[in-house]
Amino acid sequence: MTGDVRLRRLGQADLPLCLALARERGFSGGAPAWRLAFAAGEIHGAETADGSLAGAAVLLPFAGRVASLAVAVAPRRERRGIARALVAHALAAAGTADVQMHAPGAALAFCERVGFQVVGATVRFAGAPRGSAPSPRGLALRPVGGADLAGILAQDEIAFGAPRRTLLEALLPASARVALATGGGRPVGYGVAWEDGDAVAIGPIVAEDPAAALLLAGHLAAGHALPVRVDVPADRAPMLAWARGAGLSRLGTAALLSRGGRPLPGRRERIHALVTASLA
C-alpha cells in the first residue's frame, strides 16, 4: 500500500466520503445501506492525503461466530495493495469468526489469493414486478408487531447460524414493509422491504419452505413507486423462477466465498433473499 494512505475506522460523519466512493465505483444503493452498515458493524477506510477514500471495508460481525465482509477500492487507486491491506485489517478484527463475502467475476481471483474459496453464488434481479402474489393453501400473511421481534430473531439465527440482532434492530424500524408468514397457527417465515437509494430492496426473506418464501416475496415486492431489487442465492430455484416470472431483469451473479472455504453455519436453505449481497 502506498505511503499516502492510512487506515482508520470510519464513523457516521464520514458518510459523504462513503457515498463518494460508491459513486466512483458505480455501485447501486445509497445512504440507507451505508447507515445500516454503520449501525450494525464497522467500516474501515483507506484515507488519502487529500481526505478522500481510496477504499473501504465493511465488516458486520455477528456474535463472534460469523462475519460479513465487503471491500471496495476506488478505480484510480487499484493495484496498489489497498484492497489487500483492508482485507487483512478486517480479518484481524473478525478474529476466529467464519467470514463470508461476495465477489463479482473480476474480483474473484483476488479474493482467492487472500484466502477465500467459493462456496456458493448469489443472483441479483431488479425491475418493476408484475403479477399477483401466490396464495398457497394453509399459509397467510400478517403485519409484524413489537411482540414478534423475539420470534423473528430466533428464526433468523437458525437460518444464518449466528444472531443478527444488531442488523435487524437497525433495519426493521426503517423498513417500508415487514411481514410474517404463518402456517398451522405459527410463524414460518418473515421478510422485509426497505428503500435503498433509487430502489426498494427486498430482503431478507427467511422461511422454512419455498411456499412461504414466495408468498412473502410477492407481497413485499408489490405496490412500490420505485423499482425493486432482490439478491437471491443461486440454488433457490423457486425464488429464481419467481423473479423471472415477475418480469425482473437479471443484473448479474456474484460468487459467495468463505474464509478458507469453511462451510457457513446455519440452515442456509431457509434464506431465500439476502439483505443485500454486500451486507449479509
Question: What are these language model-derived features?
Answer:
Residues A93-G105, H224-A234, A254:
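Conserved GNAT acetyl-CoA-binding A-motif
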